[in-house]
Swiss-Prot record:
CDD domains found in the cross-reference section: catalase_peroxidase_1, catalase_peroxidase_2
PTM per Swiss-Prot/TrEMBL: Formation of the three residue Trp-Tyr-Met cross-link is important for the catalase, but not the peroxidase activity of the enzyme.
Record carries keyword Metal-binding: yes
Site (Transition state stabilizer): R93
GO molecular function, one term: metal ion binding
Assembly: Homodimer or homotetramer.
Protein name, as recorded: Catalase-peroxidase
């Protein structure tokens, strides 16, 4: 062995580098994953701390960018020739697959972060050859730099593609800020092989939150369930997967038909010719995957899905030909050159009606996938499809609206939309709230209102738990929920078990009386919204709890400006998915789940953008404030509830207490005096994890020290303020 291959310190061979070798999770695979609370830190972000993407985007001349995209789409490149001389269909697929990962269950996925650039999404089988689309766009991204994110550029390119082929879009909004590392928090499934479907149990019951039928797909298998060409069964899969991304039946038909009006499928040969995906490709391939040895590997020889052919006679022009073909022919099952199941007109009908994508001397018959056939054969989709066939204007409007929803669903409220093409129409799925149309309360008013709230019969626990319930619906994944709008007083939130409807009604009635008295006393236009008053009540409760603990100078920040949404502005079905099935901060768990309560706590904390220290201090603080659902005493490790003390940590870390589960389920535990056996406390897994997990115990020890009381109060107030304002995009 040469000296160059020897480690300079030990003389042994250098086999691994920093970060390599057996990891903790290899030894303890069930270890609580706190890494998802440390994602996207400034250490991974190359931009300056002062960089403001919204301001950078506003400096962009969007018309210039669009013109560059228009020009690019018709400039075919030899290294990846454009089908029909137009990259528009490829860009539509790229944008669709960027947005189409969104699912309503947890709001994760979607186009909002540009995550198609990273694993695993950049290497999913369903995203084959979309690496070429991004590489084609690189000169435009390079030209405009930080002024437009990849996330925005991919969606804008899809819109430009539609416009360049004769379609009038509903609009476009910028404001999607790029991430710089994969999103490790998103659960895409437990399968270990591409296209695995262990996510199904029983009679094809799809695992909760997942929005695709197989690992590595966006929605459904185009050949049918597990490749079986059954259009009716495919329709059931389509309805479930599209429904899980917030699309109804009409939107589903419009999106399917609208997207398949353009471009073609690629299956010129056996996929055995196709090389590894980008993440598995060679270093010299430079992030390009799926290199094919079939012929030239591109153009007429391209292999992507394995299905081969186009749906319409003019694949680069918006028209109604998709439906004309779907209902104009009778279809029969056949195989593509790659061996994939697809459908062609019976008896050779339609031959020579579709141009070849690259060879002007060749023509073809149209094709349909099994998923397309569901648009005709599914008993619900079929009448919608026939209506669109007979009413092209309805189809165009439905597709425009559904495409806008698809590509903007995870952006949150309209206040985050940027650019000159933001549509004026307010849409119910945007969770609208009224604009502020009154003078806001000032510091003197805030002090007066806090005194009036504390003078009522409401307890610290009631004030804190109501404010928390109002704010904690927020999820950063799709920017939905939060305290703005005061939707906790509306259906469905007012009836959620976790919100303690009876107590909630009492608190709201009391706060409404305070609101009415204050507003009626104003001579001018000054008003306080109930949304603001709910949060202010929580802040007043925290301040009172601090005083109860001997901290008289604590002031919880409060920023007015929330407004009250109406029931008409609130889609009950859409908001139902925000109902917390588990909220470890309130020691609440509805039902039983395959995952542990502590994992659900971390999941919730990640959606709230909390760090591990913030999660820790909030749990400890909310416990001593007696904010559990139903005022359950699990985890209330204090003899002075409603006082903002660090007692939770002091007593959890007390070695004179020994813990044991109360049942085989190991969900509730009793803490008994180690010597006498006397019962001292009860707690849940969410409580005990802060003493059991070594990382969380280290944080608990910080707050359990004798000199940490002031730090605890300060950190709790800061974390509380953060949660109360997560949906205040107007403050950014």
């Amino acid at each position: 062995m040469s000296s160059a291959s020897k480690c300079p310190f030990s003389g042994g061979a250098l086999k691994f580098t920093a970060g390599s070798g057996t990891a903790n999770r290899d030894w303890w695979p069930n270890q609580l994953n706190l890494q998802i609370l440390r994602q996207h830190s400034p250490k991974s972000n190359p931009m300056d701390k002062a960089f403001n993407y919204a301001e950078a985007f506003k400096s962009l001349d969007l018309a210039d960018v669009k013109q560059d995209i228009f020009d690019l789409m018709k400039s075919s490149q030899d290294w990846w020739p454009a089908d029909y001389g137009h990259y528009g269909p490829l860009f539509i697929r790229m944008a669709w697959h960027s947005a189409g990962t969104y699912r309503i269950g947890d709001g994760r996925g979607g186009a909002g972060t540009g995550n198609q650039r990273f694993a695993p999404i950049n290497s999913w089988p369903d995203n084959a050859n979309l690496d070429k689309a991004r590489m084609l766009l690189w000169p435009i991204k390079q030209k405009y730099g930080a002024k437009i994110s990849w996330a925005d550029l991919m969606i804008l390119a899809g819109n430009c593609a539609l416009e360049s082929m004769g379609f009038k879009t509903f609009g476009f909004a910028g404001g999607r800020e790029d991430i710089w590392e994969p999103e490790e928090d998103i659960y895409w499934g437990a399968e270990t092989e591409w296209l695995g479907d262990q996510r199904y149990t029983g009679d094809r019951d799809l695992e909760a939150t997942l929005g695709a039928v197989q690992m590595g797909l966006i929605y459904v298998n185009p050949e049918g369930p597990n490749g079986h060409p059954d259009p009716v069964a495919s329709g059931r899969d389509i309805r479930e997967t599209f429904g899980r991304m917030a699309m109804n039946d009409e939107e589903t038909v419009a999106l399917t038909a609208g997207g398949h009006t353009f471009g073609k499928c690629h299956g010129a040969g056996d996929d055995a010719h196709v090389g590894p995906e980008p993440e598995g490709a060679r270093i010299e391939d430079q992030c390009l995957g799926w290199k094919s040895s079939f012929g030239t590997g591109k153009g007429v020889h391209a292999i992507t899905s394995g299905i081969e052919g186009a749906w319409t006679t003019n694949p680069t022009q918006w028209d109604n030909n998709y439906f004309e073909n779907l209902f104009g022919y009778e279809w029969e099952l056949t195989k593509s050159p790659a061996g994939a199941n697809q459908w062609v007109p019976q008896g050779g009908a339609g031959a020579n009606t579709v141009p070849d994508a690259h060879d002007p001397s060749r023509r073809h018959a149209p094709i349909m996938t099994t998923a397309d056939m569901a648009m005709r054969m599914d008993p619900i989709y079929s009448p919608i499809s026939r209506r669109f066939l007979d009413n092209p204007d309805q189809f165009a409007d439905a597709f425009a609206r559904a495409w806008f929803k698809l590509t903007h669903r995870d952006m949150g409220p309209r206040s985050r939309y940027l650019g000159p093409e933001v549509p004026e129409e307010e849409l119910i799925w945007q969770d609208p709230v009224p604009a502020v149309n009154h003078e806001l309360i000032n510091e003197q008013d805030i002090a007066t209102l806090k005194s009036q709230i504390l003078a009522t019969n409401l307890t610290v626990s009631q004030l804190v738990s109501t404010a928390w319930a109002s704010a904690v619906t927020y999820r950063n994944s799709d920017k939905r929920g939060g305290a703005n709008g005061a939707r906790i007083r509306l259906a469905p939130q007012r009836d959620w078990e976790v919100n303690q409807p009876a107590q909630l009604a009492t608190v709201l009635q009391t706060l409404e009386a305070v609101q009415t008295t204050f507003n009626h006393s104003q001579i001018g236009g000054k008003r306080v919204s109930l949304a603001d008053l709910i949060v202010l009540g929580g802040c007043a409760g925290v301040e009172q709890a601090a005083k109860n603990a001997g901290w008289y100078d604590v002031k919880v920040p409060f920023k007015p400006g929330r407004t009250d949404a109406t029931q008409a502005q609130t889609d009950v079905t859409s908001f139902a998915v925000l109902e917390p099935r588990a909220d470890g901060f309130r020691n609440y768990l509805k039902g039983h789940y395959p995952v542990s309560a502590e994992e659900l706590l971390v999941d919730k904390a990640q959606l709230l953008t909390l760090t591990a220290p913030e999660m820790t201090v909030l749990v400890g603080g909310l416990r001593v404030l007696n904010a559990n659902v139903g005022q359950a005493q699990h985890g209330v490790f204090t003899h002075r509830p409603e006082s903002l003390t660090n007692d939770f940590f002091l007593n959890l870390l007390d070695m004179s207490v020994t813990w044991a589960a109360t049942s085989e389920a190991e969900e509730v535990f009793e803490g008994r005096d180690r010597k006498t056996g006397a019962l001292k406390w009860t707690g849940t897994r969410v409580d005990l994890i802060f003493g059991s997990n070594s990382q969380l115990r280290a944080l608990a020890e910080v707050y359990g020290c004798e000199d940490s009381q002031q730090r605890f109060v300060q950190d709790f107030v800061a974390a509380w303020d953060k949660v109360m304002n997560l949906d205040r995009f107007d403050l950014a």
